[in-house]
């Protein structure tokens, strides 16, 4: 009886053929598991988005609102430390969005593109608030005026002098920044203010400037400058309705204090 010879052992060398001309298929190595850190922040992002979708902003802390914005700006990094660092540096969401670009850059993890996008959010907010003043009598929408001016100016690091030009119905014609000054002074020239009002056919003005210190208390120079502008405008039929000083801590109306 003839014995069947044993089958040859397969070649142990990768890629070599056995006697049956069989080429072993190369095994694709299993994908490495995602780092635990990646899995952590992706899961956190999903949970935070779900909470916002279901409950709205009332369910989120300020740093979590910032996180939601930073998710798209910084797609592959844990943004919670950056959001908390921004709030620690600038105090509030308004402070973060109102901060100048060069100060935003000083926060670790905030590159130029991120800082620009944060400022874009602030710009959209300002435009939204300003749109509330269009085609409305400004004096009857005073809270909207204050909200807009506070958003636009309260967190500026230098003094800024802004004028709201109104027509005879007290509707906003133009909103212009006339001067940028130092941290505690802005040069203002009454004749230039009146000249611009005449160019726009404005019949009334509201002056607004900020105090970067945060304290909106008017200085003697603020009061004197207001009186000079009122005196220059009055003979030309231009009324000065108010001069509002904006600070991080609130605002002051010189008209309300009967200072001119």
Swiss-Prot record:
Alphabetical list of CDD domains matching this protein: MPN_DUF2466
Domain MPN residues, every copy: 138-260
Keyword Methyltransferase applies: no
Top-level taxon of the source organism: Bacteria
GO molecular function list: metal ion binding; metallopeptidase activity
Residues that coordinate or bind Zn(2+): 209, 211, 222
Family: Belongs to the UPF0758 family.
NCBIfam families named among the record's database cross-references: PRK00024.1, radc
PANTHER family, per database record: DNA REPAIR PROTEIN RADC, UPF0758 PROTEIN YEES-RELATED
Name this polypeptide is given: UPF0758 protein Smed_1459
């Amino acid at each position: 009886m003839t014995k069947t010879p044993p089958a040859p052992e397969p070649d142990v060398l990768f890629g070599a053929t056995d006697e049956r001309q069989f080429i072993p298929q190369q095994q694709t190595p299993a994908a490495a598991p995602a780092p635990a850190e990646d899995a952590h922040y992706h899961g956190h992002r999903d949970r935070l988005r779900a909470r916002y979708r279901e409950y709205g902003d009332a369910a989120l802390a300020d740093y979590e609102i910032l996180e939601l914005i930073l998710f798209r700006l910084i797609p592959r990094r844990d943004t919670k430390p950056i959001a908390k660092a921004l709030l620690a540096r600038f105090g509030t969401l308004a402070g973060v969005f109102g901060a100048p670009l060069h100060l935003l850059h000083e926060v670790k993890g905030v590159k130029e593109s991120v800082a620009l996008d944060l400022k874009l959010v602030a710009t959209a907010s300002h435009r939204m608030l300003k749109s509330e003043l269009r085609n409305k009598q400004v004096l009857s929408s005073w809270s909207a005026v204050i909200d807009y001016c506070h958003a636009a100016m309260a967190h500026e690091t230098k003094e800024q002098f802004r004028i709201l030009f109104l027509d005879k119905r007290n509707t906003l014609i133009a909103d212009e920044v006339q001067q940028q000054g130092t941290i505690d002074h802005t040069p203002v020239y009454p004749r230039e203010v009146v000249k611009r009002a005449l160019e726009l056919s404005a019949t009334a003005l509201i002056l607004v400037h900020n105090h970067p210190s945060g304290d909106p208390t008017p200085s003697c120079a603020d009061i004197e400058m207001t009186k000079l502008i009122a005196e220059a405008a009055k003979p030309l039929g231009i009324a000065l309705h108010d001069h509002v000083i904006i600070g991080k801590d609130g605002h002051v109306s010189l008209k309300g204090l009967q200072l001119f």
